[in-house]
From Swiss-Prot:
Described function: Catalyzes the formation of S-adenosylmethionine (AdoMet) from methionine and ATP. The overall synthetic reaction is composed of two sequential steps, AdoMet formation and the subsequent tripolyphosphate hydrolysis which occurs prior to release of AdoMet from the enzyme.
Single GO term (MF): ATP binding
Cofactor(s) it depends on: Mg(2+); K(+)
Annotated protein name in UniProt: S-adenosylmethionine synthase
Catalysis: reaction(s): L-methionine + ATP + H2O = S-adenosyl-L-methionine + phosphate + diphosphate
Organism: Leuconostoc citreum (strain KM20)
Keyword Magnesium applies: yes
CDD domains per record: S-AdoMet_synt
Binding-site list for K(+): E42
Enzyme class: transferase
Keywords on record: ATP-binding, Cytoplasm, Magnesium, Metal-binding, Nucleotide-binding, One-carbon metabolism, Potassium, Transferase
Binding site for L-methionine: E55, Q98, D241, K272
Main subcellular location: cytoplasm
Family to which the UniProt record says this protein belongs: Belongs to the AdoMet synthase family.
Length: 385
């Protein structure tokens, strides 16, 4: 039976990603002054408007409006015809202080007063696969690369009529062993100026973006290309669709290849296990796969609010384990400390490093240096096999 798998990505100019980048830009600015700040910032975008709200406890002062407008300008919304520009947008700031009840639960863990308790209950997942050098599913890796490439040709003026909003989707065909045999379909929709023909756009995007990214050994004469299949895409970004932080959590993580605990990343400081523990779970999963314990691996960690130690830890190798899964779990529990403060210290997460993750994925990044992508525990794992 023929099987298929698909992942998608969106550009930095997508309305939801604008919101994520503003939230993380504010977080970075706060952390640059106050590494111990607590933040849970949410952002909405719509035509001519950005609303910023959530909770923040910090000694830092940051100019929220300036950060928002600078972020919008960097993304490329700087022309009046886009209907949403850095110079004209209305920014409202409704941030309030974090609840004292939450703060006391985090500051003194119920099971260890010297540790930070988890900032909330919930579960997170980490995943890695040896399908690609980035340890991400190929479909997601290619979708992200398509979005970075179309940004690059737009910003370099190579295709000057492109606008910031875009989406990509890659589908692959799998054999009975779930190995990729070919790329079945590519979908790419991009915002554009009014005066370009659909024929010209499709030609340029195919030649200058798609053909530069796809591995040609996986492309054949049956590969289907859908480039702006809806036709006209002049109105885009927040002028056409509202945006909200945390609405692209599958794009941010594993493209649908793994489970997701439901918690978003952007705008949250590292005491929020939604973010920090998800990063650490990726770090652990990636090092385990790189050590050869399995071809792909998913790690689940669950927490209780105000408690440092995880409630549970589970590993699934999808039938690809090279050793017994129980041994993989024992090695994981022995080598890695999953308490929130330990995670923060191991990955040095009280730094302004988050805005760069808010577009093109939080994992598998080869264009930036992220601590949870380091393969620095492989030898320790191998020594215990």
């Amino acid at each position: 039976m023929t099987k298929y798998f698909t992942s998608e990505s969106v550009s930095a100019g997508h309305p939801d990603k604008i919101a994520d980048q503003i939230a993380d830009a504010i977080l970075d600015a706060v952390l640059a002054q106050d590494p111990n700040a607590r933040a849970a910032i949410e952002v909405t975008t719509s035509t001519g408007d950005v609303s910023i709200f959530g909770e923040l406890s910090t000694s830092a002062y940051v100019n929220v409006r300036q950060i928002a407008t600078e972020t919008i300008r960097e993304i490329g919304y700087n022309h009046a015809e886009l209907g949403f520009t850095a110079d004209s947008v209305n920014v409202s700031n409704k941030i309030v202080e974090q609840s004292g009840d939450i703060a006391q639960a985090v500051d003194n863990a119920d099971d260890d007063p010297e540790q930070l308790g988890a900032g909330d209950q919930g579960m997170v997942f980490g995943y890695a696969t040896n399908e690609t050098d980035s340890y991400l599913p190929l479909t997601l890796a290619l979708s992200h690369r398509l979005m970075r490439k179309i940004r690059d040709v737009r910003e370099a003026g190579i295709v000057g009529y492109l606008r910031p909003d875009a989406k990509a989707e890659v589908s692959v065909e799998l054999d009975d062993q779930d190995h990729i045999t070919r790329i079945a379909a590519v979908v790419l929709s991009t915002q554009h100026d009014e005066n370009v023909s659909l024929e010209q756009l499709r030609k340029d995007v195919r030649e200058l973006v798609i053909d530069q990214v796809l591995p040609q050994e996986l492309v054949d004469d049956k590969t289907i290309y859908y480039i702006n299949p809806s036709g006209r895409f002049v109105l885009g970004g927040p002028q056409a669709d509202s945006g909200l932080t945390g609405r692209k959590i599958i794009v941010d993580t594993y493209g649908g290849a793994a489970h997701h605990g439901g918690g978003a990343f952007s705008g949250k400081d590292a005491t929020k296990v939604d973010r920090s523990a998800a990063y650490f779970a990726r770090y652990v999963a990636k090092n385990l796969v790189a050590a050869g314990v399995a071809d792909k691996l998913e790690l689940q960690i669950a927490y209780a609010i105000g408690v440092a130690q995880p409630v549970s830890l589970n590993i699934d190798t999808f039938g690809t384990a090279k050793i017994d899964e129980a041994k993989i779990r024992d090695i994981t529990a022995e080598l890695f400390d999953f308490r929130p403060l330990a995670i923060i210290n191991q990955l040095n997460l009280r730094r302004p490093i988050y805005k760069q993750t808010a577009a093109f994925g939080h994992f598998g990044r080869t264009d930036i240096d992220l601590p949870w992508e380091a393969l620095d525990r492989v030898d320790e794992i191998k020594a215990r096999l």
